[in-house]
Amino acid sequence: MDRELERLDQEITLELQKIDGNLSHCFDVITKQVIPRVVAYGQVCDAISDSCEWLGTLCKSSGVVDLKRDVLLERTPVRDSDAHGNAHGDTHGNAHGDAHGEANAERSYGDVAGGEEHNSTVQSEVSDSTMGKYREDDTREQGEDDSVQRQKKRKVSLLIQERYGSSSSVMPSPDKRVPQQSLGSSPVKEQVPLPGTVIHFSTK
């Protein structure tokens, strides 16, 4: 009976030693492997949380802040100093530029006026020469028409003379009609020859 108890006691002791060894091993694993990894993971999570919080703050701030106004406020001192420096330069430059611009404007106005006067003179000369040419052409055409009409009339008169005799034989002159010796005689005794027949043709 005692031997059985001793044997059981030894077996229990061995089992407890094994359990203690396993617990020690588990403790070592947890202490040396798990806990450092958990700590590292916690640090990473903290960094992620901080980053997310910073991003959230940045988004909120960017939604509220007026960037243009801030930039203008930052650049205002520089612009004020530049404006004071440019005011004197602009005043002097504008005065000189205005005087130069007025001189250029007067010169341009004179050039334009001279150009318009020259153009009007040239146009008047061209119009006068053109009108003179048209008048010469009209005069020439009118002279040609008159010469053609005269030629037609001359041809008609020549045809009449050829057909009915000369104009002197058609109508005798007053000298041939009344002889000089019969001027003092009675008109009853003297017989005046009858005039010849005269035919008139239109020469239109």
From Swiss-Prot:
MF terms in GO: microtubule plus-end binding
Biased composition range(s): Polar residues: 120-130
Stored InterPro entries: DASH_Ask1
Biased composition (Basic and acidic residues): 78-119, 133-142
Top-level taxonomic group: Eukaryota
GO cellular component term, pick one: microtubule
GO BP, sorted A to Z: cell division; mitotic sister chromatid biorientation; positive regulation of attachment of spindle microtubules to kinetochore; positive regulation of microtubule polymerization; protein transport along microtubule to mitotic spindle pole body
Key words of the record: Cell cycle, Cell division, Centromere, Chromosome, Chromosome partition, Cytoplasm, Cytoskeleton, Kinetochore, Microtubule, Mitosis, Nucleus
Family annotation (Pfam families): DASH_Ask1
Region (Disordered): 78-204
Locations listed in the record: Nucleus; Cytoplasm, Cytoskeleton, Spindle; Chromosome, Centromere, Kinetochore
Assigned protein family: Belongs to the DASH complex ASK1 family.
General function of this protein: Component of the DASH complex that connects microtubules with kinetochores and couples microtubule depolymerisation to chromosome movement; it is involved in retrieving kinetochores to the spindle poles before their re-orientation on the spindle in early mitosis and allows microtubule depolymerization to pull chromosomes apart and resist detachment during anaphase.
Quaternary assembly: Component of the DASH complex consisting of ASK1, DAD1, DAD2, DAD3, DAD4, DAM1, DUO1, HSK3, SPC19 and SPC34, with a stoichiometry of one copy of each subunit per complex. Multiple DASH complexes oligomerize to form a ring that encircles spindle microtubules and organizes the rod-like NDC80 complexes of the outer kinetochore. DASH complex oligomerization strengthens microtubule attachments. On cytoplasmic microtubules, DASH complexes appear to form patches instead of rings.
Name used for this protein in its record: DASH complex subunit ASK1
